[in-house]
């Protein structure tokens, strides 16, 4: 390592030390499908809750069974941990009346934060009746929810252009959304350029970077293709030869994410959203690097 790069790393670590106690984190979970997965979920929630995250979110599936599990998990998180629990809510395959009922139920249950999404289109295609901006407007009619929406630094796969995608995000913010959480990414520059473009477009809410600590690189490559996320060549090289070495994969994945959050924090980012995949270890370790710890957390 050159003297210059050593100094850069030292400066990054020093800037992180100065931010201790001023970083906000949040975590995403998904509804488990088996009893073993449920045990892992609650173990992860219990461990990560000690970091006093700003909120935790739970994804929302297309089928009614998974939707019911989301409702149940959200209410249990609130009762069990006292954390702000934010359910994902999608408007695909649901009428306005159904969405209004769901939102009203959440409001009456004390849930005040919702992640509002359009959701995946059905396989048969067709134009949706509602978009995320419409859902944000509907939620604001029900109650003064704190609303998070999705943003795409590398452009949504269905968007006609980067500019059209940005205009769509602005519609969601103008409808009343309080923040945007990005799709995961690995090119930090793509996030920073996107943040600048948001400001230039008049989007004045926090653009929270979504961080995915990678433990299964092959699975990531498949998912990245579907979501239009670029996986840099250097990252492929770092995971090369680790197909049968899950422990080393975790260490590499954590190292990559730690470097990302260090650079982002230097660029003024103080809020991070972690896609945990229902596992605590990597997110917990990265938060420790950020200075978010049980004894110093907000």
From Swiss-Prot:
Its EC number is 1.5.1.54. One of its GO terms (cellular component) is cytosol. NADH binds at residues 59, 183. Its cofactor is FAD. SUPFAM superfamilies: FAD-linked oxidoreductase. InterPro entries: FAD-linked_oxidoreductase-like, Mehydrof_redctse-like, MTHF_reductase_bac. (6S)-5-methyl-5,6,7,8-tetrahydrofolate binds at residues 120, 183, 219, 279. One of its GO terms (molecular function) is FAD binding. The keyword RNA-binding does not apply. It holds the Pfam family MTHFR. GO terms for biological process: methionine biosynthetic process; tetrahydrofolate interconversion. It is an enzyme of class 1 (oxidoreductase). Keywords: Amino-acid biosynthesis, FAD, Flavoprotein, Methionine biosynthesis, NAD, Oxidoreductase. Belongs to the methylenetetrahydrofolate reductase family. Catalyzes the NADH-dependent reduction of 5,10-methylenetetrahydrofolate to 5-methyltetrahydrofolate. Is required to provide the methyl group necessary for methionine synthetase to convert homocysteine to methionine; the methyl group is given by 5-methyltetrahydrofolate. This is 5,10-methylenetetrahydrofolate reductase.
């Amino acid at each position: 390592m050159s003297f210059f790069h050593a100094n850069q790393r030292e400066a990054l670590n020093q800037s992180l030390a100065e931010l201790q106690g001023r970083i906000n984190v949040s975590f995403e979970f998904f509804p488990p499908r088996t009893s073993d997965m449920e045990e892992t979920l609650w173990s992860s929630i219990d461990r990560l809750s000690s970091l006093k995250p700003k909120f935790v979110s739970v994804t929302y599936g297309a089928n009614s069974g998974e939707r019911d599990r989301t409702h149940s998990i959200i209410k249990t998180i609130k009762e069990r941990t006292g954390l702000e629990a934010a359910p994902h809510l999608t408007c695909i395959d649901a009428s306005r009346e159904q969405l209004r009922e769901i939102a009203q139920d959440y409001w009456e249950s004390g849930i005040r934060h919702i992640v509002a999404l359009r959701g995946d289109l059905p396989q048969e295609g067709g134009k949706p009746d509602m978009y995320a901006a419409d859902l944000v407007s509907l939620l604001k009619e029900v109650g003064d929810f704190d609303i998070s929406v999705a943003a795409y630094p590398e452009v949504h796969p269905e968007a006609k252009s980067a500019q059209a995608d940005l205009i769509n995000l602005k519609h969601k913010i103008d409808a009343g959304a309080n923040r945007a959480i990005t799709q995961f990414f690995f090119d930090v520059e793509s996030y920073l350029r996107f943040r600048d473009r948001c400001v230039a477009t008049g989007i004045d809410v926090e653009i929270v970077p979504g961080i995915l600590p990678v433990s299964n690189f092959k699975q990531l490559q498949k998912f990245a293709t579907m979501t239009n996320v670029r996986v840099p060549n250097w990252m492929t090289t770092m995971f090369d030869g680790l197909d049968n070495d899950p422990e080393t994969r975790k260490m590499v994945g954590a190292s990559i994410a730690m470097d990302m959050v260090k650079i982002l924090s230097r660029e003024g980012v103080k809020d991070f959203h972690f896609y945990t995949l229902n596992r605590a270890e990597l997110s917990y370790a990265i938060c420790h690097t950020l200075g978010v710890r049980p004894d110093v957390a907000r």
